[in-house]
Regions:
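Helix N-cap and loop-to-helix transition residues
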Residues: 2, 21, 44-45, 121, ...
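Short, low-complexity N-terminal intrinsically disordered segments enriched in polar/charged residues
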Residues: 1-31, 146-165
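A generic structural signal for short
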Residues: 1-2, 41, 91
Length: 165
């Protein structure tokens, strides 16, 4: 995939996400693609990814906006920095605006996304929503544990400094 093709794919992905067009969003992924979301968990396959957009993202948020900047791609892996914002529809936090930034990682296959993950500071989002500090702490501790348990993190921690397998 060229850099221009990657940028075009990102434009389709963002437009579909903002419009709540779950099928168009899922079509940006391979049939067995995976979307790793730090709030809603992992979604595998176009059907689950479409469900995530229509029945989770747009259930819980309105006026969703997502832009990606400075995309880079080597043909197989792509990255982009993003900004997104929304207004919460979750009853406990209804009407509260949130803006977050993050770094997105895309594994690419046959012109589509085969694996998507992101690094977003969810603590910033929770603070903007007005989540109680003890609840934020509990969530951040869980995310920290999940990071520690990832195979890539374990491999990183087990090898000596300045080495890579």
């Amino acid at each position: 995939m060229t850099s221009d093709e990657f940028s075009a794919l990102l434009q389709r992905l963002m437009a579909a996400a903002e419009a709540g067009d779950a099928q168009a969003f899922a079509a940006c992924f391979t049939p067995d693609g995976i979307y790793h979301d730090y709030v809603y968990g992992d979604h595998t396959g176009r059907s689950e990814i479409a469900h995530m957009i229509s029945d989770l993202f747009h259930r819980d948020a309105q006026d969703y906006r997502w832009e990606m900047f400075d995309p880079v791609c080597d043909g197989c892996i792509g990255y982009a920095w993003s900004l997104s914002c929304f207004i919460s529809k979750v009853p406990e936090f209804a009407g509260r605006p949130v803006v977050i930034d993050g770094m997105s990682r895309f594994e690419l296959k046959d012109g589509l996304i085969s694996d998507y993950s992101e690094s977003v500071n969810g603590g910033v989002a929770m603070a903007q929503l007005g989540v109680h500090p003890l609840r934020i702490e509990k969530v951040l501790q869980r995310w920290g544990k999940q990071l520690q348990e990832r195979p890539a993190t374990r491999a990183f921690l087990e090898r000596p400094k300045r080495t890579k397998s």
